[in-house]
Swiss-Prot record:
Top-rank lineage group of the source organism: Eukaryota
One Pfam family named in its UniProt record: COX2
Keywords of the record: Copper, Electron transport, Magnesium, Membrane, Metal-binding, Mitochondrion, Mitochondrion inner membrane, Respiratory chain, Translocase, Transmembrane, Transmembrane helix, Transport
Organismal lineage: Eukaryota, Fungi, Dikarya, Ascomycota, Saccharomycotina
Major site of localization recorded for this protein: mitochondrion
Amino-acid positions noted as binding Cu cation A1 in the UniProt annotation, renumbered to this chain: 175, 210, 214, 221
Any one GO cellular component localisation term in the record: respiratory chain complex IV
EC number: 7.1.1.9
Record-linked CDD domains: CcO_II_C
Protein name, UniProt field: Cytochrome c oxidase subunit 2
Topology of this chain in the membrane: Multi-pass membrane protein
Enzyme class: translocase
Catalytic activity field: 4 Fe(II)-[cytochrome c] + O2 + 8 H(+)(in) = 4 Fe(III)-[cytochrome c] + 2 H2O + 4 H(+)(out)
Functional description taken from the UniProt entry: Component of the cytochrome c oxidase, the last enzyme in the mitochondrial electron transport chain which drives oxidative phosphorylation. The respiratory chain contains 3 multisubunit complexes succinate dehydrogenase (complex II, CII), ubiquinol-cytochrome c oxidoreductase (cytochrome b-c1 complex, complex III, CIII) and cytochrome c oxidase (complex IV, CIV), that cooperate to transfer electrons derived from NADH and succinate to molecular oxygen, creating an electrochemical gradient over the inner membrane that drives transmembrane transport and the ATP synthase.
């Protein structure tokens, strides 16, 4: 199965979901689209009938001043449809804002025009947290198969099937941290911490971009996230000289991550 996890030229469909939040957004989209098609068909039919009757007889509606029944119908019918759309929207909005007990936290900082990531739960051998900056790869440095304006020199690495909290802020202007396949879009506002959670259910590479106009190089702020197995994530921690004997790392990897396999 080929997954659609990146934007495609002339693409009109949503990217494949990799989290429960993204799946809920897709279901809500289909739910609302049903009512939109229903309204489009009904309104188009009414307009067709009115135009056809008027063309055949311009005095067809000469003495029509009001219609109590139709007025009640076009008041109640839209109200019912709005309620049918609103309730699922409110439920999904609440679920997307809910942050469950996270196994790990990643701090995301937006700057003009790059991202900075901090793994505050993990410390290296000298007692410092893992942190790095992520820049877009210029066109003249792209390798074969790389994605223009989407690939970065470094990427976020997270384990699969793990509750992850992203704490998002900015240092200069407003940015927006967005990864469509994860159903994630949250503003990065200077002086404010916003948070969102994600439970990525399959491994892969996911791309996003800054979705808030933030200056001349707004289009040069891609996001690249790699979701790997728990074993590969622990190996990545070792490559960054994280001490696996520290209590915080044991809690976030051994206890919270390995138990997911069972």
């Amino acid at each position: 199965m080929i997954r659609l996890d990146v934007p495609t030229p002339w693409g009109i469909r949503l990217q494949d979901s990799a989290t429960p939040n993204a799946e809920g957004i897709h279901e809500l989209y289909d739910h609302i689209m049903f009512y939109l098609c229903l309204i489009l068909g009904l309104v188009s039919y009414i307009l067709y009938v009115i135009i056809k009757d008027y063309k055949d007889n311009r005095f067809a509606y000469k003495y029509v001043r009001h219609g109590q029944v139709i007025e009640i119908i076009w008041t109640i019918f839209p109200a019912v449809i709005l309620l049918l759309i609103a309730f699922p929207s409110f439920i999904l909005l609440y679920l997307c804002d809910e942050v469950l007990t996270p196994a790990m936290t990643i701090k995301v900082i937006g700057l003009q025009w790059y991202w900075k990531y901090e793994y505050s739960d993990f410390v290296d051998s000298i007692g410092e947290t893992i942190e790095f900056e992520s820049y877009v790869i210029p066109d003249d440095m792209l390798e074969p198969g790389a994605l223009r304006l989407l690939d970065t020199d470094t990427s976020i690495v997270v384990p699969v099937d793990t509750h992850i909290r992203f704490v998002v802020t900015a240092n200069d202007v407003i940015h927006s941290f967005t990864i469509p396949s994860l159903g994630m879009k949250i503003d990065a506002t200077p002086g404010r911490l916003n948070q969102v959670s994600a439970l990525i259910q399959r491994t892969g590479v996911y791309y996003g971009q800054c979705s808030e106009l933030c200056g001349v190089n707004h289009g040069m702020m891609p996001i690249k996230l790699e979701c790997v197995s728990i074993e590969d994530f622990i190996e990545w921690l070792g490559e960054n000289e994280v001490s696996l004997n520290s209590s915080m790392v044991e809690q976030c990897t051994v206890n919270a991550l390995i138990l997911v396999q069972f």
